[in-house]
């Protein structure tokens, strides 16, 4: 029998601590070993028993969550799931938490927290289980995914975009599609900061809630040569530009002649995610086919696996991040299981692979 995941709760609200403990202990695989009102009390509790995962509030007395997180990562890296309010200020704070080493950030409302946590326990439990599997050796300064807490029914990409065979236009621009979840912000930062402005146009799904993706895109845009934007319907996918799907919406690739653009739309969560990697990858398979490169990276679950297989069947080049370099080897593993991955490579090799494969796509288009 597998050992339970030992969780420590750190939040200055007694109500939140009580509700969190109640909802988490409904899962037979989780054991709450303590609840602390602030990081000072948390450190005392950790001196007696070290947790597998820490659920940490951001704003607390005596020491704020970001300061404690930085201290923890410097002394003994431990998976941390941060709780942040779903506001513009909370989104900026979440980016600081990810940069400081949080494995995941979950959103909570500014009001009605008790009712929200009780109704949305499933997503928090899923994040804790993903965090418990995180390979902290691969966790440098920046990391992780942020997700909304509602756990919806599991729909397939059919609920958003019908399956069909797409055509390919010779001479159409090359494009790269990236999909990732837990550990993804760190991985995406690594890849995007190493790409020049003449790289292929890029479309990205990173599992993240509404309001958080804009802050994520803004941060990346400030440190990359590429133009990084939170996508809007009609945005053109052009060389030197990366478009990130907005939280709470699906992103689809469309084609007009030899040019690509994106469509942002609502619809049910697919594989319990909105945006969904499967939705993006299916649309890329249909719009770009063999003119595309698909990359599935670190993350929990199977979102993107079927879509990547559709890309491969449409003639696209497909790669998966290898287990050694993943924070959580879930999505690439599931894609490899069903034959969707042409080959697996380390995170360190992905930027050059994007450039090399982009060059080969250009050569193929010129020959065609």
Swiss-Prot record:
Output a single Gene Ontology CC term carried by this record: cytoplasm
* Family recorded in the similarity comment: Belongs to the CheB family.
Could you tell me where this protein is found in the cell?
Cytoplasm
Q: Name it.
A: Protein-glutamate methylesterase/protein-glutamine glutaminase 2
Looking up SUPFAM superfamilies in the UniProt record yields: CheY-like, Methylesterase CheB, C-terminal domain
Q: Which residues carry this modification: 4-aspartylphosphate?
A: 57
CDD domains in the record:
CheB_Rec, REC_CheB-like
Query: What HAMAP family does this protein map onto?
Result: CheB_chemtxs
Molecular-function GO term, any one: phosphorelay response regulator activity
- EC number in record: 3.1.1.61, 3.5.1.44
The record places domain CheB-type methylesterase at 169-355
Give the main EC class: hydrolase
| Job of this protein | Involved in chemotaxis. Part of a chemotaxis signal transduction system that modulates chemotaxis in response to various stimuli. Catalyzes the demethylation of specific methylglutamate residues introduced into the chemoreceptors (methyl-accepting chemotaxis proteins or MCP) by CheR. Also mediates the irreversible deamidation of specific glutamine residues to glutamic acid.
Reactions catalysed, semicolon-separated, are:
[protein]-L-glutamate 5-O-methyl ester + H2O = L-glutamyl-[protein] + methanol + H(+); L-glutaminyl-[protein] + H2O = L-glutamyl-[protein] + NH4(+)
Active site residues of this protein: 181, 207, 303
- Keyword Cell inner membrane attached: no
Coiled-coil residues: none
An example of a Gene Ontology BP annotation on this entry? Answer: chemotaxis
Q: What are the alphabetically sorted keywords of the record?
A: Chemotaxis, Cytoplasm, Hydrolase, Phosphoprotein
SMART domains for this protein: REC
Positions of the Response regulatory domain = 6-123
Name of the encoding gene: cheB2
Classification via InterPro entries: CheB-like, CheB_C, CheY-like_superfamily, Sig_transdc_resp-reg_Me-estase, Sig_transdc_resp-reg_receiver
What does UniProt say on post-translational modification here? Phosphorylated by CheA. Phosphorylation of the N-terminal regulatory domain activates the methylesterase activity.
What organism does this protein naturally occur in?
A: Hahella chejuensis (strain KCTC 2396)
